[in-house]
């Protein structure tokens, strides 16, 4: 079984909940889980160029809108990332280049991509049958 959602926020939330279940709710904070997802992941990969926002690092950022209903009433923006269902970043910078703006990938032909994925999925299912 796998919980790989390709969503680092969801994975950090699950890691936090699993650790809280095992060690108690006060043993692990949202800051711990975010540190695992950033600096911790970089350390596991042996990467010095990622894991934090600092001069000389990759400049990878994910920005989330907090005016969505899912964040209503949140008082701690970092806790809200994990606890208020942050599903989709509004803007994403990778290596210093904006790759997602206003929730969309610039110049992506989404209908074409969806059609191609459906074709490939159908071909895979046909091969399995």
Language model: regions and residue ranges:
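Active-site core of metal-dependent hydrolases
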Residues: 1-6, 20-28
């Amino acid at each position: 079984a796998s919980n790989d959602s390709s969503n680092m926020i969801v994975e950090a939330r699950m890691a936090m909940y699993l650790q809280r279940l095992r060690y108690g709710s006060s043993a692990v904070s949202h800051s711990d889980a975010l540190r695992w997802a950033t600096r911790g992941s970089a350390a596991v990969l042996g990467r010095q160029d990622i894991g934090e926002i600092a001069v000389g690092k990759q400049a990878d950022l994910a920005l989330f809108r907090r005016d969505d209903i899912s964040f209503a009433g949140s008082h701690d923006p970092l806790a809200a990332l994990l606890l208020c269902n942050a599903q989709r970043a509004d803007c994403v910078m990778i290596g210093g280049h904006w790759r997602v703006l206003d929730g969309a990938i610039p110049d992506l032909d989404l209908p074409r991509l969806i059609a191609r994925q459906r074709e490939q999925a159908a071909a895979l299912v046909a091969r399995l049958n």
